[in-house]
Amino acid sequence: ARKFFVGRNWPEL
């Protein structure tokens, strides 16, 4: 995950 998706389980967007 990116810096704005940190703490989540989202894929590399």
Curated annotation (Swiss-Prot):
Location relative to the cell: Secreted, Cell wall
This protein's name: 36 kDa cell wall protein
Protein species of origin: Arabidopsis thaliana (Mouse-ear cress)
Keyword line: Cell wall, Secreted
Domain of life according to the entry: Eukaryota
Keyword Secreted: yes
GO cellular component: extracellular region
